[in-house]
């Protein structure tokens, strides 16, 4: 009889990383009844502790909230990449201690012992924890919560640096276009991921990616039909471990539990495909001037709207956006009254449930990868307005490479002083809400493919099976 095995997952902090990690764990234990998973949760100083509220999660998935690591007590940090590298490093002891508690005791019989430790599955940003896995003499795997195009881009840049001595940051202020093997079209420097905008972040990012070569495989939250070009490139002899596309990994259960909310009841009263939904992720927010441009657009667009509007943290402070105590303090005077019959402005939004509602006709999005997959799953076209991290690259892929989105401003950066005009926003909303557009047709087709990928015989189902076979 096969002995049970334990995998240790260490997601990066942040709800997007944790949610997709939990979905990955659920897929694995559903496929193999001898597999146990422990998720070690690292908490950012300004974030809430993680609590599992999903009663359907298997008893073979266990969560451990790690003690908070001792960090610099200052509210500001000069470089996010440096902060996160230090954050992960400072958790090594806590990860090690947690894993020791999972190990079988040597005097236990095989029939009563804990599952054998089979490996670590580390978040894409936490490759330095390979050192801890090596101490326990077990293999490491990477769980890449973004897309395979990002993985391919990072691997390509890492090779350019290490083998060709090329410094990508020297191009960031130019209007150059790059030949990147994982893309069909020339790739504009203006939409590079945010981690390549300065030398220190670039060094940290590429060093982290370089360590992927020490792992036994890379799980990616994508599916072959969506990213065939990038996945074929990664499978063509690139110096990288085997890549397993296993997505889309989405928490669809939570969307069903939100059915009774006021927001969804309001959507029930709207015609099919009539509402444009604006939402910019757990870290997305705008300054007052940009909020007023969006409000002006929505008031004059002629479309019904649902707008998730969050208040940015104080400038320079390490914190997440929050809900406004009073929306009238940031919106134009009288806006809420004038738009009361056609729109709703809310704080936090149950995004997955909203995107699954038949009234939603388009999604103005930051192009975070989880949000992108949710939108594709539900067949909702995107108007791309990226803000940070790899979202600019995601927008380029969706708009230019795949034709699954329209552009609002592909090269927008959250920390810039640029204010996107009402005219540009209105153009994007008008295009994304077109009922007979080619973009909408392509998204509908990709939606069907995303669902087929996960069922028996589908591309991601088969890929996950290959991963399980070699644990």
UniProtKB/Swiss-Prot annotation:
The keyword Glycosyltransferase applies. Keywords: Glycosyltransferase, Transferase. It comes from the Eukaryota. InterPro entries: UDP-glycosyltransf_plant (IPR050481), UDP_glucos_trans (IPR002213), UDP_glycos_trans_CS (IPR035595). The keyword Glycosyltransferase applies. It is an enzyme of class 2 (transferase). Optimum pH is 6.75. Pfam families: UDPGT. Its EC number is 2.4.1.-. Optimum temperature is 30 degrees Celsius. UDP-alpha-D-glucose binds at residues 282, 348-349, 366-374, 388-391. One of its GO terms (molecular function) is UDP-glucosyltransferase activity. Belongs to the UDP-glycosyltransferase family. Glycosyltransferase that possesses chalcone and flavonol 2'-O-glycosyltransferase activity. Converts phloretin to phlorizin (phloretin 2'-O-glucoside), a potent antioxidant. Possesses glycosyltransferase activity toward eriodictyol, apigenin, luteolin, kaempferol, quercetin, isoliquiritigenin, butein and caffeic acid. This is UDP-glycosyltransferase 71A16. It comes from Pyrus communis (Pear). The gene is UGT71A16.
């Amino acid at each position: 009889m096969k002995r049970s095995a334990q995998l240790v997952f260490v997601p990066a902090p942040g709800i997007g990383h944790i949610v997709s990690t939990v979905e990955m764990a659920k897929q694995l234990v559903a496929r193999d009844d001898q597999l146990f998973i422990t998720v070690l949760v690292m908490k950012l100083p300004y974030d809430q502790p993680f609590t599992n509220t999903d009663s359907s999660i298997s008893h073979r998935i266990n969560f451990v909230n790690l003690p908070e690591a001792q960090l610099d007590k200052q509210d500001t940090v000069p470089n996010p990449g440096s902060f996160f590298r230090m954050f992960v490093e400072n958790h090594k002891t806590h990860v090690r201690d947690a894993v020791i508690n999972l190990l079988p005791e040597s005097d236990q019989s095989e029939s009563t012992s804990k599952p054998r430790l089979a490996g670590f599955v580390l978040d894409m940003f936490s490759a330095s924890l390979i050192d801890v896995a090596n101490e326990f003499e077990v293999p490491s795997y990477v769980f890449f919560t973004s897309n395979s195009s990002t993985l391919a881009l990072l691997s390509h840049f890492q090779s350019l640096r290490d083998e060709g001595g090329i410094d990508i940051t020297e191009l960031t202020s130019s209007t150059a276009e790059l030949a990147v093997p994982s893309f069909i079209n020339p790739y504009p420097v203006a939409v590079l991921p945010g981690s390549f905008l300065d030398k220190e972040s670039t060094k940290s990012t590429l060093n982290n990616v370089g360590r992927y070569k020490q792992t036994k495989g890379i799980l990616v939250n994508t599916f072959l039909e969506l990213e065939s070009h990038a996945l074929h490139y990664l499978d063509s002899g690139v110096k990288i471990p085997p890549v397993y596309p296993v997505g889309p990994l989405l928490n669809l259960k939570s969307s069903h539990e939100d059915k009774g909310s006021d927001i969804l009841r309001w959507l029930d009263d709207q015609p099919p495909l009539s509402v444009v939904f604006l939402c910019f992720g757990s870290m997305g927010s705008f300054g007052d001037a940009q909020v007023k441009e969006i409000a002006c657009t929505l008031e004059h667009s002629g479309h019904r709207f649902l707008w998730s509007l969050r208040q940015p943290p104080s400038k320079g402070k390490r914190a997440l956006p929050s809900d406004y105590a009073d929306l009238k303090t940031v919106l134009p005077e009288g806006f809420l009254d004038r738009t009361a019959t056609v729109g709703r402005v809310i704080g936090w939004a149950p995004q997955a449930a909203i995107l699954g509602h038949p009234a939603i006709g388009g999604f103005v999005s930051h192009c975070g990868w989880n949000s992108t997959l949710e939108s594709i799953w539900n067949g909702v076209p995107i108007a791309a307005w990226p803000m940070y991290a790899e979202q600019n690259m995601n927008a380029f892929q969706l708009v230019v490479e795949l034709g699954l989105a329209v552009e609002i401003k592909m090269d927008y950066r959250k920390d810039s002083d640029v204010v996107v005009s009402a005219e540009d926003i209105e153009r994007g909303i008008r295009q994304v809400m077109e009922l007979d557009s080619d973009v909408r047709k392509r998204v509908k087709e990709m939606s069907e493919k995303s669902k087929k990928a996960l069922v028996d015989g589908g591309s991601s189902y088969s890929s996950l099976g290959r991963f399980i076979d070699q644990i």
